[in-house]
Amino acid sequence: MCHGFFVHNHLVMFTSKKLLAYLLLLVVWLPTHSVAQQAIDEDDTGAWYMYFFSKRFTDSQWGLQGDVQYRNWDLGGDLEQLLLRGGLTWTTANKAVTLTQGYGNITSGAFGDSDSTSNEHRIYQEALIRHGLGERVKLRHRLRTEQRWVEGQDFRTRFRYGLFMDIPLNDTKIRPGTWYLAFYNEVFLNLEKNIGNGRRVKTFDRNRLYAALGHDLGRNFRLQGGYMHQATSSVDKGQIQLSLHHSF
């Protein structure tokens, strides 16, 4: 009977210690797990809200174009970038090619709770080449060079190539009332690797892949909502994008 009592007590003590160990592990694990679940990192989906405009002067091949983009690390409130850009355009008589000389100002915000920002001044040159693929598909090739003055870095230049595609769904071309699909892929290449103070960047800067559903609202407005995946040399990040396109 004493032997049975000893065994019973031993089992109770062992079980109690084991249960205590599990409880301690749970107490330690739960707070850290909760923090990990709640923490925001650069892989969380961001959101870009954008307005694009283009203006052709009357009876002229000259015009203006520009955009305002409010980019967030999250869905809203954590500023990634505020981009203001505009340029003077010249379009060939057949409207197949548009050349642009422009300027951009970019305010970049730090990720997370920090309110610190940095500024960039940018001059760019662009060639946009348009052509069709069959009756419905419209393609645009965009080649852009950028001269960049980024705060805290040496002068830098960058090359970009983007391929854009629009496909009308309920018509043969995009006009008021038309729903359409919009796609693009754009690659960015750094032309300098040294950016000052012993810091270097890779030639590959980033790639953006985008898909969206668009609707021609009429009165020279189009609305697009979609998703863009951006892969850089260090971060892969998804972005929800909502854009309003205005031509006048």
Task: Kindly give the residue locations of the regions a language model identified.
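Bacterial Sec-dependent N-terminal signal peptides
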Residues: 1-40, 248
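Start-of-domain marker
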Residues: 37-92, 98
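Residues that define the transmembrane beta-barrel architecture of outer-membrane proteins
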Residues: 43-47, 80-84, 119-123, 153-161, ...
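Residues on the lipid-exposed face of transmembrane beta-strands in outer-membrane beta-barrel proteins
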Residues: 51-55, 86-90, 125-129, 145, ...
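Short loop/turn motifs that connect adjacent beta-strands in outer-membrane beta-barrel proteins
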Residues: 56-62, 91-96, 132-139, 169-179, ...
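Transmembrane beta-strands of outer-membrane beta-barrel proteins
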Residues: 62-66, 84, 97-101, 139-143, ...
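Transmembrane beta-strands of outer-membrane beta-barrel pores
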Residues: 68-74, 92, 103-109, 131, ...
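Outer-membrane beta-barrel transmembrane domain signature
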Residues: 138, 142-222
